[in-house]
């Protein structure tokens, strides 16, 4: 997720039903990896129809949004959780993760409302049966060169970490920070329930050596991974996907790989994601 991706959260409305046939293969890539997509990349954030779309693409799951600009409660409501689980079951697609992208607009580092969001997200994740919660730190929530905001986030994460530990849930920090900067936060919080949500494209945009960073953080500090491109299909942009695979192999990472962005200008989303899915499966199978 980045600043541009964050804008997609403001949509929050229903997407017209699609009637395309299923093109992809939904079989899990292997025992190590499951391939999903962010709901805001394949439709409006929070749209329950994302599971049917994911099925058409051939994905294993969807990373769903906790809330949207038009509904700050959304999945904090038990009825919405029930409907989301039913939609996933009907599509034969998993709920692959939870994300709080609204933190980009209403920042965790300064707005007291977000403390309840993050606390409640632990309960929501447990109810949905997911392990990892993405906490977005871009736009208004950017921590880069903000020691005061970073310290507030550390204190808030310390407060929620025991609850996450007890629930068996992990809070993942996705930001513009480097691996050493992330590690400083993780060490300050001091909880196995707070890790890094690693986005290979964002870190490439920042000029970091993503392959070294992946190895530095290791599987114990990376909770989940975004495979993303901006304006290109996955595998055709700036990120060297085979080298990402090698780095993940080297640290023994296993889990979800969620696709994000990766829709070239003028190319339909569905067509793009069918191709993105095939590309990732061909390498990670």
Task: List where the protein language model places each region.
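Glycine-rich, proline-tolerant flexible connector loops at the mouths of alpha/beta enzymes
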Residues: 65-84, 140-144
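Charged helix-capping and loop-helix junction motifs
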Residues: 77-83, 111-119, 146-157, 209-215, ...
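Hydrophobic faces of well-ordered beta-strands that scaffold small-molecule active sites
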Residues: 33-38, 62-64, 95-100, 133-135, ...
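Conserved long hydrophobic alpha-helices within structured protein cores
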Residues: 55-64, 130
């Amino acid at each position: 997720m980045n600043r541009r991706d964050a804008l997609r959260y403001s949509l929050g409305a229903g997407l017209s039903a699609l009637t395309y046939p299923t093109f992809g293969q939904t079989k899990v890539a292997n025992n190590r990896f499951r391939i999903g997509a962010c709901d805001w990349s394949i439709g409006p954030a929070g749209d329950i129809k994302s599971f049917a779309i994911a099925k058409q693409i051939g994905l294993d799951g969807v990373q769903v949004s906790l809330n949207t600009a038009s509904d700050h409660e959304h999945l904090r409501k038990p009825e919405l959780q029930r409907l989301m689980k039913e939609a996933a079951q009907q599509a034969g697609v998993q709920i692959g993760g939870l994300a709080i992208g609204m933190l980009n607009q209403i920042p965790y580092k300064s707005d007291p409302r977000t403390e309840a969001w993050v606390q409640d997200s632990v309960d929501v994740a447990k109810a949905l049966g997911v392990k990892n919660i993405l906490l977005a730190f871009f736009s208004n929530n950017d921590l880069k060169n903000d020691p005061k905001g970073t310290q507030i986030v550390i204190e808030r994460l310390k407060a929620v970490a025991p609850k996450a530990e007890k629930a068996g849930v992990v809070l993942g920090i996705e930001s513009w920070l480097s691996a050493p900067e992330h590690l400083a936060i993780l060490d300050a919080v001091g909880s196995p329930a707070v890790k890094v949500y690693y986005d290979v494209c964002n870190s490439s945009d920042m000029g970091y050596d993503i392959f070294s960073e992946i190895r530095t953080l290791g599987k114990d500090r990376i909770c989940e991974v975004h495979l993303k491109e901006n304006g290109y299909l996955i595998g055709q942009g700036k990120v060297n996907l085979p080298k990402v695979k090698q780095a993940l192999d080297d640290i023994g990472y296993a889990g979800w790989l969620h696709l994000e962005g990766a829709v070239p200008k003028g190319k339909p989303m569905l067509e793009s994601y069918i191709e993105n899915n095939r590309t990732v499966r061909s390498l990670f199978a």
